[in-house]
Structure formats: C-alpha cells, structure tokens
Amino acid sequence: MAAKEVKFGRSAREKMLRGVDILADAVKVTLGPKGRNVVIDKSFGAPRITKDGVTVAKEIELEDKFENMGAQMVREVASKTNDIAGDGTTTATVLAQAIVREGAKAVAAGMNPMDLKRGIDLAVAEVVKDLLAKAKTINTSDEVAQVGTISANGEKQIGLDIAEAMQKVGNEGVITVEEAKTAETELEVVDGMQFDRGYLSPYFVTNPEKMVADLEDAYILLHEKKLSNLQAMLPVLEAVVQTGKPLLIIAEDVEGEALATLVVNKLRGGLKIAAVKAPGFGDRRKAMLEDIAILTGGTVISEDLGIKLESVTLDMLGRAKKVSITKENTTIVDGAGQKSDIEGRVAQIKAQIEETTSDYDREKLQERLAKLAGGVAVIRVGGATEVEVKEKKDRIDDALNATRAAVQEGIVPGGGVALLRSSVKITVKGENDDQDAGVNIVRRALQSPARQIVENAGDEASIVVGKILEKDTDDFGYNAQTGEYGDMIAMGIIDPVKVVRTALQDAASVASLLITTEAMIAELPKKDAPAMPGGMGGMGGMDMM
C-alpha cells in the first residue's frame, strides 16, 4: 500500500478552499445572459468552446491532490444538479463557493462546524418552502418558449423550437437533440418509442464523452426469455455480421457467457452491438415487447409461439433508423413497422383502456399508448462549423431540461432575483448562536448568483442588488441583457423552480460536507526510480574500424 499524506484542520481547509475557488472561478464566468465563453483544449481536434457550467467543471483536474479534492466535491454539485434538473449547474457552483467561503471563515473564528451545518440546513429548508409557495405554473406555449429562450442564453429560435416540439409530442414526450449535416437547425417529429432500460454493460457505449450507445440503421432482436447460451445465438449473430449493420438485443436478461462474448466482440470491432433488458414485468413485459415488434416490423422470439432462437432469420428481426441507449433509457427512432399495424395496435390499447376498471392498469396502458402514438421529436442542430454546432447543442440540451423542469414545478423570476428575495424572508432561528451563524451564511450566499450575473454584465453588483431589494414586489429585478430594471416575468426573465431549488439543495449539501471536514488523506506522489547508469567507464576514445 502506498504511503499517504494527511492534513488536518486549518491547513486542510485552506487547500480544499483553494481547489473550490479554482473550479468555481472558471465556471462562474459563464453565468447569465452576458456570461463569457470558456475554451477547453482537446487532445485531438479543435478546442471546444462552451458556456455550459457542468462541461467546464468536468474538465478541471488539479495537480495538488488536496486542492483537487475540494474541486471535485464542487464538481459533484454541478453534476448532481445537472442529473436532477438538467440546468442550473453554474448557479449551484456559485452558491456552493459562497457557502464554503463564509463557512470556512466561521470555522476559523472558532464556531462549531456541526452547528453551522444545522443552521445551513434550517435556512435551506425555509427557502425551498418559500420558492415553491411563490412558483407560477406554466400553461401556454409562449411561456414554454420563454423558458427555453432564457436557458439557451437568449436565443429566441431555440425557445420556439422546444415549445413546438413539446406541443407536438406532449410535455412528457421524448425529445432528442442531434447534430445536423446542414447549417440550419430544424425540428422533425418521427415515429419512435422510449423505455426505461439502459445498456447492460458500459462497454457497449459508442460515445464515451456522453456515455451513450448510438446505433444507426440497426437490426433489433426481441427475445422474451433470458439469454445465457451463446451457441443458440450464433446463427443470427453471423447473419447480422454479414450485413455490416449494428444489432440491438432486447431480452429478459443477457448474462454469463453470452454477455461476455458480445462485449468482447464489440471491443474487437467485429460486431456493432448493444443489449438491454426488456421493459416492464410479467405479462406487461410481453405486451411491451409486442409493441416494440409492431413499431419495428419484427417478431418477438417466444417459445410459446414455437420459434427457437437457433432458427431465427433476418426477416424476423425489427429495424430502426436510429437507436440511442443511455445508462437509464433506450430510444428507438423511426422503426420499420407498417403504419396500419401501428394504428391497429393503438386502437387495441385504446379499447383496453376503455374496458379496464383498475386505475393502475389504465395508467400503464396510457403510458404504452403514449409511447406508441406520441412519437419522438428530433431537433437537428445546424451551424457553420463543428465547434459552433457542439456549443449550440449544449445550449439546446440545457434549454430542453430547463423547460421540462418548468413544466413540472412552475417558474419564479430569473436573474437570481428569486433567491435574492428569499434571502430577506428567512426568519428561522437556530438553537444557539452558531446555528444562527449558519442561517446567516445562507442569507449572504443567496445574493451571490444575482451578484455574479451583474458582474459578468460589467455592472456594479452592490448598487444593483441594493436597488432590487429597495422595491418590495417579488417580480422586480434587473435585466442584465439590456441594463433595465422592471418586472422580470413580464420581461420574460424566468427560472424553473426545480432548477433553482435543486441548485440550492445540492450546493448546501456539498458545502456543508466541506465545512465539517477536519482531516484529508491523499496518496503521496510516487518518487521516480533512479535512471539507468551510463556506459562502462574507460571506453571513450576507442578507434572505429
């Protein structure tokens, strides 16, 4: 076991705080409508330009092990907020930095870290309650477009595209974002389906950066039982290899020898393949496999029907233009099923919905109906260069997540105003002075997102924040894009409650851990082995024959 270095107390916290500051300072320049770009060097290809907080955070790795621990903890804030709300990563990072800074000062002044943490938790709980109480629900397509526009850094067309996509496939519908081959960004609705099962092995991934397996123009094998015997699968695998097309296997499970062999073949590059578990359980699994079969023009391989795996031919496999698989979901786009068959299946499910008396069954049938009939909206992102397309795609992904979050929990005034207003409404008291200090830490930290947005726009933060707080109306704030004061919601500057709430909760959670840290342990850097000695002595000056 390698030797470790241990740091305690103040020296540990100082190192950690430095790491937090390096990461947060790089991320927070992207906040707001006048946020700056960050350029990231890539080991191959052109540098990447982004205004996406989590993308910047993921690129930062520090040389000093202790500083790096601090940076990675805050990176975790950005990642977690991104996973839950899909946006608000920069806000979460700014809040975490503010809470850690104030907390470190309080601990250095001799306050009890555990009481500070309790005070922080009390204040956060009250702010969350306040945010949910003043949320406004989103109803119209215009409001959806507004949210999308703001999250896409003020690009109106992106907001309109997202609103149109949500109108076509419903708020819970599947919307995917792809890179286009042209300079224009366009929206297309295709017949598709998404279910909540991800890849069985991360080795199936084709895009390691996004951890996604994409299969273009794929065959789909649908099997209702477990697959563990490789011999039975060989004929169909060989037939697919001959075509040069990728294969998706959907089965109850793929395990043991079968899964290992598929992974090895994928890694060697002989077979483009991915495997996922079939969605649902019991009879519903059979029904959902049948739905996928109808959508893709394939057949479910079932021994009840007398079809053995050994005798499967290519025409029994389904086909789809594109399959996209993440850790949690599989999306099948543009299946090769006949329109008349799909319509027949939809009518059959509608009839079952009418007949059923169970609310649970009705809900599950409606889910199946939405998957079959709803389709998938595809936003194809265009641009003049590859760098521009990637940057725009990041923004559309953010905007899409923000819009979904807004539809779920409603909206509050944007521009950091909602948190700013909540900061003066905190009335909760702790059990002692140290807990009250924790409450005050949150009170001050809640001003940091608004201040950062104003600073990034090149204005004086203290003056702007003071002016906003002078007015007593919840919606009054500052438009950093135009430099005007007014009603934020009327100006279309809004934030989804889910994004603001998640950013605050995640930031407070990780910041509390950092404040209560008393010791840090890291591996000592390995000493380089001594170099090989030079040649034998006394051999200089030999005559060359």
Curated annotation (Swiss-Prot):
The keyword Cytoplasm applies. ATP binds at residues 30-33, 51, 87-91, 415, 495. The lineage of its organism: Bacteria, Pseudomonadati, Pseudomonadota, Alphaproteobacteria, Hyphomicrobiales. This is Chaperonin GroEL 5. It comes from the Bacteria. Disulfide bonds: none annotated. PROSITE patterns: CHAPERONINS_CPN60 (PS00296). SUPFAM superfamilies: GroEL apical domain-like, GroEL equatorial domain-like, GroEL-intermediate domain like. It is found in: Cytoplasm. Belongs to the chaperonin (HSP60) family.
